[in-house]
């Protein structure tokens, strides 16, 4: 019995990063900047990739049962603005359509950053994406190290991490 309880505890701790964080409008609403993005399919988040998102604004609606996110992508170097509306499902993940079906949630938050995990499902399969956004236009070494650890937890190789700050010239 003790072995079973220890196993259950170990599994609970190892899967803790998959829990959805509850957020309030005061934590979410406002201007954000994309800092880092990574995916298990790097093509999707590389320069010109369909999931390389430059977040600009997040709005919490109905006590965060809905998130409205305004962001840019680049097609052949040209910025294109998009707005998606994600509705929270029973499992706590937000669901929306953009370049396929997306299931996302906030996995980490602090006063000045939020980290999203997204599963994108399209004709080519399933892609795990993580994205960290900040209130400021730059990040610290500690934020990058924390993001690298989160990427590792989602089995995304460190070499798949993209620094978005140098290429974010949309909405300026």
From Swiss-Prot:
Protein induction: Repressed by estrogens, androgens and thyroxine in adults (at protein level). Repression by estrogens and androgens does not occur in immature 20-day old animals. Induced by prolonged light deprivation and starvation (at protein level).
Keyword Plastid tagged: no
Signal peptide: 1-16
Cysteine disulfide links: 60-64, 79-170
Classification via InterPro entries: Calycin (IPR012674), Lipocalin (IPR002345), Lipocalin_CS (IPR022272), Lipocln_cytosolic_FA-bd_dom (IPR000566), OBP-like (IPR002448)
UniProt similarity note: Belongs to the calycin superfamily. Lipocalin family.
Descriptive protein name: Female-specific lacrimal gland protein
Gene that encodes the chain: FLP
């Amino acid at each position: 019995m003790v072995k079973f309880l220890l196993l259950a505890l170990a599994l609970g701790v190892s899967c803790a990063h998959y829990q959805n964080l509850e957020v309030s409008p005061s934590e979410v609403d406002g201007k954000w900047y994309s800092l880092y993005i990574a995916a298990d399919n790097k093509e999707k988040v590389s320069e010109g990739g369909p999931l390389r998102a430059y977040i600009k604004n997040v709005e919490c609606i109905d006590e965060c049962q809905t998130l409205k996110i305004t962001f840019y992508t680049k097609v052949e170097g040209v910025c294109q603005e998009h707005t998606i509306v994600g509705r929270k499902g029973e499992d706590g993940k937000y669901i929306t359509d953009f370049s396929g079906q997306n299931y996302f949630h906030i996995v980490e938050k602090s006063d000045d950053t939020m980290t999203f995990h997204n599963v994108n499902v399209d004709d080519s399969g399933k892609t795990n994406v993580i994205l960290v956004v900040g209130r400021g236009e730059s990040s610290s070494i500690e934020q990058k190290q924390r993001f690298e650890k989160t990427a590792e937890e989602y089995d995304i190789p460190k070499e798949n991490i993209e620094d978005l700050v140098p290429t974010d010239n949309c909405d300026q």
